[in-house]
Amino acid sequence: MLNILVTGGGGQLSLAIAEAAENTADNYTILSHAELDICDHKAVESMLRSKEIDVVVNCAAYTNVERAEEDMDVYRINRDAVAGLSTLCKRYKTTLLHISTDYVFGGDTTRNTPYLEDDPTAPINNYGLSKAEGEEAVVANGGIVIRTSWLYSPWGNNFVRTIIGLTTTEPTLKVVDDQRGTPTSALTLARMIVGLIERRQILHMSGIYHYTDRGEATWYEFACEIARICNASCTITACSSTDRPTRAKRPAYSVLSKRRICTFDEIILTDWKVALAECITRIKQN
């Protein structure tokens, strides 16, 4: 039996991991920010020692992309705390699996093919830069980075739940159609992570991997599929990013190649539309 620590408890991925791990033989400890602040080096070290942690799944992160353009706390959490965590995990021979993002890319404005795991990062906002710098520390200390993209779940604040809400209150919506990535369900990502732990593959991994659902879409196409599944009468029209200016720039293209993770025979990617339908069914059940 392995002792697993999941940080960022209460977030959509940690909730999905808790669900996916319900019937496993391993011991999962899932802690919220209030219960374990990854910026508190001494508290993290005490947890690793006292619980004899074998694997840390770090879901804790500063994720407000807009606010990060002005709030430098993003670097304290996504870079400095992650560097400290990875150093401690190396010291105590604990496997670290750190969750990262497609937003470490974006600087290559002509890109139109999926990013490989070893492609150079080129973030275009503070959030992406902080995550890229955190990744560097994890890899330097022998840890595992799993990049994902456009994450959503049946819980919390995310694009799917927002669009479902808006389609019930607004007759029309405009959604950007010039940013392309892959919508990814926290449910499928969590099952993949728990599977790696159950099969003990995680103990023999290091470096950078990508995991998203299969396929790609723009935010507009994503919104249209949400509306279709929900039989919403709201009219959704496409617009450009210049029509919806934001403080933080977003990648025009950030599709991730899953080449490396798919070398594991047990990894089966779920089509993003299938995963979305499952999530929406769960939302409606709640």
Segments (PLM) and residue ranges:
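Adenosine-cofactor binding site in Rossmann-like domains, unifying the SAM/SAH pocket
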Residues: 22, 27-44
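NAD(P)H-binding glycine-rich loop region in Rossmannoid oxidoreductase-like domains
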Residues: 38-79
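Catalytic helix-loop patch of NAD(P)-dependent Rossmann-fold dehydrogenases
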Residues: 76, 80-84, 104-105, 109-146, ...
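NAD(P)-dependent short-chain dehydrogenase/reductase
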Residues: 136-181, 187-188, 194-195
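Mid/C-terminal beta-alpha module of Rossmann-like enzyme folds, strongest
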Residues: 192, 199-245
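Conserved C-terminal active-site "lid" loop/helix of NAD(P)H-dependent oxidoreductases
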Residues: 208, 218-224, 239-279, 283-286
